Structures are given as structure tokens and as C-alpha cells.
A protein has these predicted regions:
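ADP-ribose/NAD+-binding catalytic cleft of ART/PARP-like enzymes
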Residues: 1-40, 55-57
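Conserved NAD+-utilizing ADP-ribose enzyme module
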Residues: 1-6, 10, 58-183
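Short, surface-exposed beta-edge/turn micro-motifs
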Residues: 12-15, 39-43, 49, 99-102
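Short, flexible loop/turn elements at secondary-structure junctions
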Residues: 21-23, 45, 108
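Short, glycine-/Ser/Thr-/acidic-enriched flexible segments
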Residues: 22-24, 50-51, 111
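Surface-exposed flexible segments
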Residues: 24-43, 114-130
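Short, well-structured hydrophobic secondary-structure segments
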Residues: 42-66
Length: 183
């Protein structure tokens, strides 16, 4: 299991969240994700520490990375002094600016930690949210949290460097990234 992402400025108390562009969800029912390794129906949640992974429109491809205890100083240079970096392609910038993204706070008693991925939680039962939070300015959230939002023309060169390094990382919706370019 990967090391958890580092704390961010203004990180609130531990809670579990489901992030969506749909602000009308009244109940989350277990389902089988098309990207999950398991065929068991589940409800997914993310903890507060990893909530910034979802400060994006759902389909936005993104690469997140941070140092781990075993990260070499050479690999840490990819962070360029940041504690945590979230990278997106420039073609998504306007969609990030205009997206309306909400976070549903979920009851922790229904969830258990995902044994495969740190920061993620699973429930086998239907879950009703406790609270709906409008995330607002997604770019501003990154700035306030001191998370570097790195804008690149194509994610693949950076992604390839990160996954070949000793950094910890997460990639979401990478299938939506621009095509790889010839090297």
C-alpha cells in the first residue's frame, strides 16, 4: 500500500467524502466500478487527507505525487520544492475553473479502509450522506491548501517520470489524457 499523501494547509478533521458534480444525490448504493479490481458492489469514499485528489471535474485526468520516506533527493527534485503536486493538462483548465463540484460527507461507521489503497474507504451497504459541501473555486482550494497545481500540455512525460521514480503517486482518469506524443 502506498504512503498516504502529506497533510495540506487548512486540512480539516478526519471525515469520509464522496465527491461529485451531481448535487442531488440522496443515497449512495453499492455498485461495481468499471475500474475496480473486485466484482463486489461497494460504495467508495475518500478521507479528508486525500480529498484534494478530487478537487477536479470527474473526468479530468490528473497525476498527483509527493515524497515518501524512501524518496531519493534526485527524485524529490520533481517536486520543485512543493510538498505535494497535482498535475493536469492545460486543455482542462477552463473546465476546472467552471466546474461545480460538491463533496458529500458520509457516516464513518458504515465504512472500512480499502486494503489495497490508502486513504480510500469501502462500504457494502447503502449510505445516506450527512452533509453536502459546495467546493467552490477548485483552483483557489489548491492555492489555499499549498498544493502545487502544475499545468502541463501533456501528462504522459511527467507521469512516466513520476512512476519510474521513488515518489508516491496516484493517477486518476488518465485514459482521458491527451495522446502520448512521439518522444
Amino acid at each position: 500500500m502506498r504512503d498516504p499523501a502529506p497533510a495540506y494547509d487548512g486540512e480539516g478533521r478526519h471525515a469520509l467524502w464522496h465527491v461529485s458534480e451531481n448535487a442531488t444525490i440522496e443515497r449512495f448504493d453499492p455498485h461495481v466500478s468499471t475500474t475496480a479490481a473486485s466484482s463486489e458492489p461497494r460504495v467508495w469514499a475518500v478521507d479528508t487527507r486525500h480529498l484534494p485528489f478530487y478537487w477536479f471535474p470527474r473526468e479530468c485526468p490528473r497525476c498527483m505525487f509527493w515524497a515518501a520516506p524512501n524518496t531519493t533527493s534526485e527524485d524529490a527534485d520533481l517536486l520543485a520544492g512543493a510538498t505535494r503536486v497535482h498535475a493536469v493538462e492545460d486543455c482542462w483548465l477552463e473546465r476546472i475553473r467552471s466546474a461545480r463540484v460538491v463533496a458529500y460527507r458520509l457516516p464513518e461507521k458504515c465504512f472500512a479502509p480499502d486494503p489495497e489503497v490508502g486513504g480510500y474507504w469501502l462500504s457494502r451497504e447503502s449510505v445516506e450522506p450527512l452533509e453536502l459541501v459546495e467546493l467552490g473555486d477548485l483552483l483557489g482550494l489548491h492555492a489555499a491548501a499549498a498544493i502545487e497545481l502544475r499545468i502541463v500540455s501533456n501528462l504522459w512525460p511527467l507521469w512516466d517520470r513520476v512512476v519510474a521514480s521513488t515518489l508516491e503517486f496516484s493517477g486518476i482518469r488518465l485514459h482521458n489524457a491527451e495522446s502520448r506524443r512521439d518522444r
